[in-house]
């Protein structure tokens, strides 16, 4: 006998659980990758100055911008 209450997505219960597992795993991997990459970029060039002269690496950018303005 057919299901009396068909799914809105057309997936069976087993297929929905499999899809959910893959979705959760890929989301966790994406977030972990983003955290690692943000940490690596932060160590290379912090975007918030931790000390008063924390923006010394941007002196070249300031001189380049002076030519544009």
UniProtKB/Swiss-Prot annotation:
Residues 57-69 form a propeptide. A bacteriochlorophyll binds at residues 20, 38. One of its GO terms (molecular function) is electron transporter, transferring electrons within the cyclic electron transport pathway of photosynthesis activity. It comes from the Bacteria. Residues 45-56 are periplasmic. The chain crosses the membrane at residues 22-44. It is found in: Cell inner membrane. The keyword Membrane applies. Its main location: membrane. Keywords: Antenna complex, Bacteriochlorophyll, Cell inner membrane, Cell membrane, Chlorophyll, Chromophore, Light-harvesting polypeptide, Magnesium, Membrane, Metal-binding, Transmembrane, Transmembrane helix. It is a single-pass type II membrane protein. The keyword Phosphoprotein does not apply. It holds the Pfam family LHC. NCBIfam families: pufB_517_ASD. Antenna complexes are light-harvesting systems, which transfer the excitation energy to the reaction centers. The core complex is formed by different alpha and beta chains, binding bacteriochlorophyll molecules, and arranged most probably in tetrameric structures disposed around the reaction center. The non-pigmented gamma chains may constitute additional components. This is Light-harvesting protein B-1015 beta chain.
């Amino acid at each position: 006998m057919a299901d009396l209450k068909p799914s809105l997505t057309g997936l069976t219960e087993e297929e929905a659980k499999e899809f959910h597992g893959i979705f959760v795993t890929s989301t966790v991997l994406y977030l972990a990758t983003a955290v690692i990459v943000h940490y690596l970029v932060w160590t290379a060039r912090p975007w918030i100055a931790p000390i008063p002269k924390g923006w010394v690496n941007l002196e070249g950018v300031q001189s380049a911008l002076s030519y544009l303005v």
